Amino acid sequence: MANEKFIRNKTHLNVGTIGHVDHGKTTLTAAITQVLSARGLAKSRAYDQIDNAPEERERGITIKTSHVEYETEKRHYAHVDCPGHADYVKNMITGAAQMDAAILVVSGADSVMPQTREHILLARQVGVPKIVVFLNKCDLSPDEQILELVEMEVRELLSQYDFPGDDIPVIRGSALKALEGDAHYVAQVNKLIETLDTYIEDPVREVDKPFLMPVEDVFTITGRGTVVTGRVERGQVKAGDEVEIVGLKETRKTIVTAVEMFKKDLEFAQAGDNVGALLRGINREDVQRGQVLAKPGSVKPHSKFIAQVYVLTKEEGGRHTAFFSQYRPQFYFRTTDITGVVELQGDVKMVMPGDNAELVVTLNNPIAIEEGTKFSIREGGKTVGAGSVSKLLN
């Protein structure tokens, strides 16, 4: 039997729950599905179904993640919840689950905790555009003044990391009580869902962003010219478009004279398509794997940047020992490995397997990167870490 068709009649949004361990992220995820299933918009998922997350691999790293989907009258949501703190760090840094928005869950009974801070910082560094706060376990802390203080503390923390702390919606509730059917708390979960629909704008679809395609392979078609193949990362391209070849060498302009998919001419290619693009006046040796084709002026080559990285543990197949400044691994961006030198930041003297660290990286060759670009760190073809560019330095 054919798989059920995905009906695209609503805007799709990716969200995730973040926050300190045991503050109620998974319980809230279960409560959202239960409340929406009562309106016929979701399948109710029990706590242990979500908590029993399957393992996935992204950029050579194993991550436990639960994916839950639900709809509102306005949107279709894909919601990601991770069981362990390390899974969150890995998930956000590798971009395994790109979030258009995050629901920060803070226990009203415990207030801000270390991972609350760490998850907000990560959300800032990997470019999560919007955060909504759910103050959970308010049934355990009925004192209004205490809840006011907790809310104030959360808002201050968000402002500290450049989120609009004063304007972010904070919804008070109890995920557990909502699951038990308490009418007041069910209404608060409904209020959270309504807030997701109204406070978070529709994301700009990848198709509408400026064209970019990493070059995977290059070959010559006799009598026609040079063809580069790859998967369109974002935007669209059609015959007659001017593009730039960016990275590794001097940036060059050319015209795309044809776009093909599975040996058939395409009117245009868009984000997600695997295509071949025929380039005018370009020799085979002018372009190579690791470069990108991009809309002119949309992306520049860079070789020095600040990155947020997660270093794999020995058990995850990573290094057995720490590394220091002047460490020289390969950085795998999109389709290629480039050697680079690492400098540790601040008073950090070494980075241990399992650490989440900020590094300055200088690559041997400039390549097309932007803030938010993801990469793997490799040694001899083996993944030892994953990172995200947080700031360009040249």
Swiss-Prot record:
A Pfam family this chain is assigned to: GTP_EFTU_D3
EC number(s) on file: 3.6.5.3
GO cellular component terms, semicolon-separated: cytosol
Highest taxon, organism lineage: Bacteria
Region described as G2: 60-64
Annotated InterPro entries: EF-Tu_GTP-bd, EF-Tu_GTPase, EFTu-like_2, EFTU_2, G_TR_CS, P-loop_NTPase, Small_GTP-bd, T_Tr_GTP-bd_dom
Keywords associated with the record: Cytoplasm, Elongation factor, GTP-binding, Hydrolase, Magnesium, Metal-binding, Nucleotide-binding, Protein biosynthesis
Compartments where located: Cytoplasm
Enzyme superclass (EC): hydrolase
Segments forming domain tr-type G: 10-204
Catalytic activity: GTP + H2O = GDP + phosphate + H(+)
Positions annotated to bind GTP: 19-26, 81-85, 136-139
UniProt main location, coarse: cytoplasm
PANTHER family in the record: ELONGATION FACTOR TU, MITOCHONDRIAL, ELONGATION FACTOR TU-RELATED
Self-association state and partner proteins as the record states: Monomer.
Protein name: Elongation factor Tu
Protein species of origin: Aster yellows witches'-broom phytoplasma (strain AYWB)
Record gene name: tuf
